[in-house]
Each structure stands twice: as structure tokens, then as C-alpha cells.
């Protein structure tokens, strides 16, 4: 299935376009997070967040402070970063919307949180904080543990890693024990069962334009404008091994994994590429397309535009 949302509400559809449920709300700036069968939508800079599963709404959290970011786990727990002027709070909410944890961070001590990610099992969280030290910009990547292990640690912090002169703008748990941090010129792969360890460091020479993930792969679209095709696509596995390095010229708007393939799409076309860089499909659309979604079935995709939903099957 897939989700559609706006300032007025959110709906969940089967892949054939049938509405399963819809929920109305009023938000100025809604943002959605999805993990497995769980969905969260929050009003960024507002104070409300809803959690859903494929059957409908399961909870609502009302915060006393503006929401900066929302994340949801596979079991429906929500993590929200809240703004309190000179401090921030990372709150965890149960599926029913009740607050179960709260971690306070300060701008003067920890820095400003630019990205967070919760593990699918909701037991761990990675956050990236940016701070200025003299003339230098520094990023700290911090791990929190919300299981029994974290109870004995200050603010549940179980590890931290420093990046000098690098902004780490993207952090992501790709499964329960692996997390990735992407900086301007570096990709770090961390392993965390209870405490984190840095497993692999990958240096990136070109400017990173887009990062995308699956539970097996890390994909980067890089600027390649100085040599041939305008873009370079590189893919790494969780062991830090490069499994794809190719260039392309498609003016993509969306890029994502579908198993061991990569989908690149824009309003008028859709390209499917395997991990050898071979194009398996190149399809043009008559009407502008909003998105192309994998269905979980090999070679079957849902095409969404403003007027209809269509299922396509590749030969």
C-alpha cells in the first residue's frame, strides 16, 4: 500500500487504489515517517503528532513545545525532537501517544540536533549535533539506548563520535543493529547491539546530492558534472563494500531501492537499474507522475499521478 497526506489529513491506500482509512487533521507543515507497517505524521513547528498502522490511527501525542523532527519505529513508537529555545528535548512516545522517555540536550553543551533516527525496535536512537567551536564547525554523532542498558548511563548516552570541520546532516538506522552517518565527504557505518562501534569509514570525493537506504544498502547520488554524465550513483553494502559505481544523466526527482535494484524516476519517466549498472527498464509516461512505488512483487510497480493509480508489470 501507500500513503497520501496533506495539510488537511492523511489516507492509506491499497496498491490497487482502494482507500483503507483516512484521518483528518489541520497542520501547517506535515511531515511523515514510515517504518515497516507503522506511520507517523507530525506538524513541524507545531505540537501534534499522530501514529498509525495499516488498520488506522493508534495514537496521538500532543507536545508542549514545537516539533522539529519526527521518527517512527517498526512497532509504532514515535521519537520527536522538540525545540525549547536554548535547549532541545528528544522524546519517545508509546504507540498510544504517551511519553515514555525524555532526553534533554542544550545548545551550549551538546549543540543543535540536525537529524535523528530511531532503530526499528525503538530501543536505540542516533542523533547528529552541530556546534561551533571557535572558528570550526564540529558535528557529534551520539547514540542513545532506551533498553535496560541505557538506564545506567547519563541521559541514556552509550557512545559518541566527533567529526571536525564536517557537517553530518544525515543519520539513519537501517536495521536494529546497523546505523549510518553521512557527512559532506564521508560515510560512517556503525554497529550497535548495546554500545556503538565504528565499523567502516568511506571517503567520498564528489559532492553528495542525495542519500537513500534499504536494510541492505546505502546509496549515494553524487555530482559528476565535471566529467561526462551529470550524476554518479554509488552503492555500498553494510560491510562498506562498494557494489555499484556508475554514471547517469536522468533528471531524477525520486531514487530508491527495490531489493537488489535501484529505481530512478521523475514526472515523465522511470528507470530500473540492477547492481551491475545495467538498465532493466526505461519507461516514459503520458501524464505527469508523482511517484513510482515498489509493491514487493518482482517487476510490479504502482504508478501514482494526480488523477489515477496504475499498476505496471515489467516483462
What are these regions (language model features)?
Residues 14-16, 53-56, 93-98, 146-149, ...:
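Short loop/turn segments that connect beta-strands within beta-propeller blades
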Residues 16-24, 56-62, 99-106, 152-162, ...:
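A short beta-strand motif characteristic of beta-propeller blades
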Residues 19-128:
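Non-cytosolic head/periplasmic domains of membrane-anchored proteins
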Residues 2, 39, 78-79, 122-125, ...:
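Hydrophobic beta-strand positions that form the internal "hydrophobic ladder"
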Residues 190-285:
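Intrinsically disordered, low-complexity segments enriched in Gly and acidic/Ser/Thr residues
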Amino acid at each position: 500500500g501507500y500513503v497520501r497526506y496533506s495539510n488537511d489529513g492523511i489516507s492509506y491506500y491499497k496498491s490497487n487504489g482502494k482507500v483503507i482509512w483516512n484521518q483528518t487533521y489541520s497542520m501547517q507543515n506535515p511531515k511523515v515517517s514510515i517504518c515497516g507497517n507503522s506511520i507517523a505524521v507530525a506538524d513541524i513547528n507545531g505540537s501534534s503528532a499522530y501514529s498509525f498502522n495499516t488498520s488506522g490511527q493508534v495514537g496521538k501525542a500532543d507536545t508542549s513545545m514545537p516539533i522539529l523532527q519526527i521518527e517512527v519505529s517498526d512497532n509504532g513508537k514515535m521519537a520527536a525532537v522538540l525545540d525549547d529555545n536554548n535547549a532541545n528535548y528528544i522524546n519517545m512516545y508509546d504507540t498510544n501517544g504517551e511519553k515514555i522517555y525524555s532526553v534533554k540536550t542544550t545548545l551550549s553543551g551538546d549543540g543543535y540536533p540536525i537529524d535523528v533516527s530511531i532503530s526499528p525496535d525503538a530501543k536505540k536512537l542516533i542523533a547528529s549535533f552541530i556546534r561551533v567551536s571557535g572558528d570550526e564547525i564540529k558535528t557529534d554523532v551520539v547514540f542513545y539506548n532506551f533498553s535496560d542498558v541505557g538506564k545506567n548511563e547519563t541521559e541514556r548516552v552509550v557512545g559518541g563520535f566527533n567529526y571536525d570541520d564536517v557537517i553530518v546532516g544525515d543519520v539513519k538506522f537501517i536495521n536494529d543493529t546497523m546505523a549510518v552517518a553521512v557527512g559532506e565527504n564521508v560515510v560512517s557505518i556503525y554497529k550497535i547491539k548495546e554500545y556503538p562501534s565504528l565499523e567502516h569509514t568511506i571517503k567520498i570525493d564528489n559532492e553528495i546530492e542525495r542519500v537513500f537506504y534499504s536494510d541492505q544498502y546505502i546509496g549515494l547520488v553524487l555530482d559528476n558534472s565535471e566529467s561526462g554524465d551529470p550524476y554518479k550513483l554509488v552503492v555500498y553494502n553494510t560491510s562498506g563494500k562498494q557494489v555499484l559505481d556508475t554514471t547517469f544523466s536522468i533528471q531524477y526527482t525520486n531514487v530508491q531501492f527495490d531489493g537488489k535494484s535501484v529505481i530512478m524516476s521523475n514526472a515523465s519517466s522511470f528507470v530500473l537499474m540492477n547492481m551491475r549498472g545495467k538498465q532493466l527498464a526505461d519507461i516514459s509516461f503520458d501524464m505527469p507522475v508523482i511517484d513510482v512505488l515498489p509493491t514487493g512483487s518482482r517487476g510490479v510497480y504502482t504508478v501514482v499521478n494526480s488523477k489515477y493509480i496504475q499498476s505496471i508489470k515489467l516483462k
